[in-house]
Amino acid sequence: MKAIAYYTSLPINDPNALQDIELPAPVAGPRDLLVEVKAISVNPVDTKVRQNVAPENGAAKVLGWDVAGVVKAVGSEVTLFKAGDKVFYAGSLVRPGGNSELHTVDERIVGHMPKSLGFAEAAALPLTAITAWELLFERLQVREGKQDEGQSLLIVGAAGGVGSILTQLASQLTALKVIGTASRPETQEWAKALGADLVIDHSQPLSEALKNAGQAQVTHVASLTQTDHHLDQLVDALQPQGKLALIDDPKTLDVSKLKRKSLSLHWEFMYTRSMFETTDMIEQHNLLNRVAELIDAGTLKTTVGEHFGVINATNLRRAHALLESGKAKGKIVLEGF
């Protein structure tokens, strides 16, 4: 089968940073689906792994953790899917990625694809949707419906991949007042269009910008970028006994600053369940099915930014370069081999 892989960590402008190769087709394990990959999306995790994780013993390492495709075969213990089903998923970091014609994945972290979307639009969703859902409803323990009326959520980086889904989930499914941050006029408009009640500029001190906008403090913060840079401002912005959740990778984080207000800290990493095969791993199957229903109902919309053409090394190098530049808006998708 065709695949795109790397053998050594190289700068993305090196032609060998990602290469077109041939690999044997994978074989599905008992709980696995064998998926014909139709479309993929590129995420910051792809660039981080490529830059920092050397393949073992000279083997080819395949990236890619957002896939939409069709089930070709199922393992002996599969109960949730059958051959021919259209699926979408984000896979597992401890298994090969999905930048290949065929891919195997545990059924418990796979959802039925939204009926109203094509493969490329669907491939843009899984990783960011799982991250946003788990952060909001599991880490911050926000409740659907009207139960959290009077509470508020500050989303730092509301126009990014996760922020774009999180803004929609919070504004559409909860009673929270949603305040997003974005630094450019076009991304501020994007956050407003996705449902943010208020958008502030995160290139300014956040606690001051909140006060100037008439929002003295918030009960919840979702910090999606530069948490270490913003930490003092986030502590100021949170009410006593508030909740702070983050998804990024700060080099250091002085959590003693949270003590005086008894603030709780919650880390969201969507690969925890698949990495450790937790007993509740199937929750990612359930939430992806729910996301598909919300997409088909028009409650949520996909966040495709750019379509980079067919899935090959040249186009994937272009996608990685754009992500590394920090100038990508919405998700980058590729489709077909």
Name each region found by the language model.
Residues 94-107:
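A structural motif shared across PLP-dependent enzymes of the aminotransferase-like
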Residues 98-99, 183-190, 252-255:
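Short, glycine/polar-rich helix-capping loops at beta-to-alpha or helix-loop-helix junctions
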Residues 293-306, 317-337:
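C-terminal capping/lid region of NAD(P)-dependent oxidoreductase domains
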Residues 85-86, 102, 152, 243:
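Residue-level marker of beta-strand positions
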Residues 24-41, 51-94:
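Glycine-rich beta-strand-centered segment in the early N-terminal region that forms part
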